[in-house]
Amino acid sequence: MTTLEAFAKARSEGRAALIPYLTAGFPSREGFLQAVEEVLPYADLLEIGLPYSDPLGDGPVIQRASELALRKGMSVQGALELVREVRALTEKPLFLMTYLNPVLAWGPERFFGLFKQAGATGVILPDLPPDEDPGLVRLAQEIGLETVFLLAPTSTDARIATVVRHATGFVYAVSVTGVTGMRERLPEEVKDLVRRIKARTALPVAVGFGVSGKATAAQAAVADGVVVGSALVRALEEGRSLAPLLQEIRQGLQRLEANPGLKESSKKPLS
């Protein structure tokens, strides 16, 4: 299943796509795979976070998960193996969220090539402004990975135009200025951010940061998709089942009226 097909399927069902985030190797290798099996029936796409020692864009919940996964021996090689195992479980799009440092440490061509071979659909690069290293972005795309970048409510229209020009797959709209984490309510600015992004690209737009339940999911459902991370990781941290939370969030993603249809994107890797 392609990324556009996954978003289109959700839209045909009158809802935003659900994109669960899980940290590779948390709460353990086996626990991670169990969590994947629990979220897959609800997920349209899946985001897997590569644990990193200095996750500047992540809040305390995901920071703790990364620290524990690293202490238990999770590594880039371990994440590769997990992506391969997850790919054997599903045909749904799988996106690897990674900071730039591990990519550079392994060498971009090797890193991207191995994750593509393992079954990743694309990479989310939260700390890479794509116009600062278009060659690296182009390399990922030529290897066959979709490239996803973040935009915030503070992003200017000019900045949005620059970022979406380098993006493939979908565009990640950050609901708040700050780090990941659960919130009781999302700021109203998220609607305007989604509108401004969609005015400049045919790619799907997914909202992340702060979605923790039905109410915040409903707010975020102005977008084509919604990423849920900290709330799921917190549930794993506390030893709770993920199904009740996923059911609640799916209810919030249901729309009374479907958003305007996704246009078939003709975007190709940068040349």
UniProtKB/Swiss-Prot annotation:
It catalyses: (1S,2R)-1-C-(indol-3-yl)glycerol 3-phosphate + L-serine = D-glyceraldehyde 3-phosphate + L-tryptophan + H2O. Its EC number is 4.2.1.20. Pathway: Amino-acid biosynthesis; L-tryptophan biosynthesis; L-tryptophan from chorismate: step 5/5. One of its GO terms (cellular component) is cytosol. It is an enzyme of class 4 (lyase). It comes from the Bacteria. The keyword Acyltransferase does not apply. The active site is at 47 (proton acceptor), 58 (proton acceptor). CDD domains: Tryptophan_synthase_alpha. Gene3D superfamilies: Aldolase class I. Coiled coil: none annotated. Keywords: Amino-acid biosynthesis, Aromatic amino acid biosynthesis, Lyase, Tryptophan biosynthesis. GO terms for molecular function: tryptophan synthase activity. The keyword Amino-acid biosynthesis applies. Tetramer of two alpha and two beta chains. Belongs to the TrpA family. HAMAP family: Trp_synth_alpha (MF_00131). The alpha subunit is responsible for the aldol cleavage of indoleglycerol phosphate to indole and glyceraldehyde 3-phosphate. This is Tryptophan synthase alpha chain.
